[in-house]
Amino acid sequence: GTQVQVTYDMPMNEVVLDFFDRLKSTSRGYASLDYHFDRYQSANLVKLDLLINGDKVDALALIVHKDNAHYKGRQLTEKMKELIPRQMFDVAIQAAIGGQIIARTSVKALRKNVLAKCYGGDVSRKRKLLEKQKAGKKRMKQVGNVEVPQEAFLAVLRLDS
């Protein structure tokens, strides 16, 4: 058959993260990759932190180019929203650069229907039960820990480049 040789200058970060796997799967194993390190070059990079309920998760931090930071932050928070299971309280997922939050989403709380046993039209009783539930959720959020599943750590590496 015919052979094609393509030569590119590309950041090493792009090669390391999933490029080789994608090349093999796209070509069904026929393509090969040969590379050599050319030079160091300065770039405008920032550290993208992931906060879950206000706590930094160092294992999920990324170093990204400043131009792509907002996009990667949004992508990371949306992916975590899919992977973190629902809790009894709202879970805030934020992407931050330094102290500045650039993307935010939240996993909604599971809710029990506290009004199921209230029949009739006593609105004040219903409101009291809902307020009591709301206060309990607030207390839970202060002491609650969120377990980050193992798939979340692998998903960070598989974000679309």
Swiss-Prot record:
Coiled coil (UniProt feature): none
Principal subcellular localisation of the protein: membrane
One CC-aspect GO term: plasma membrane
Membrane topology summary: Peripheral membrane protein
ATP-binding recorded as keyword: no
Subcellular location: Cell membrane
Key words of the record: Cell membrane, GTP-binding, Hydrolase, Membrane, Nucleotide-binding, Protein biosynthesis
Organism: Pseudomonas fluorescens
Identification of the protein by name: Elongation factor 4
Plastid among keywords: no
Signal peptide: none
Gene Ontology molecular-function annotations: GTP binding; GTPase activity; ribosome binding
GO biological process: positive regulation of translation; translation
Stated role: Required for accurate and efficient protein synthesis under certain stress conditions. May act as a fidelity factor of the translation reaction, by catalyzing a one-codon backward translocation of tRNAs on improperly translocated ribosomes. Back-translocation proceeds from a post-translocation (POST) complex to a pre-translocation (PRE) complex, thus giving elongation factor G a second chance to translocate the tRNAs correctly. Binds to ribosomes in a GTP-dependent manner.
Catalytic activities: GTP + H2O = GDP + phosphate + H(+)
Enzyme nomenclature, EC number: 3.6.5.n1
Domain of life: Bacteria
Family: Belongs to the GTP-binding elongation factor family. LepA subfamily.
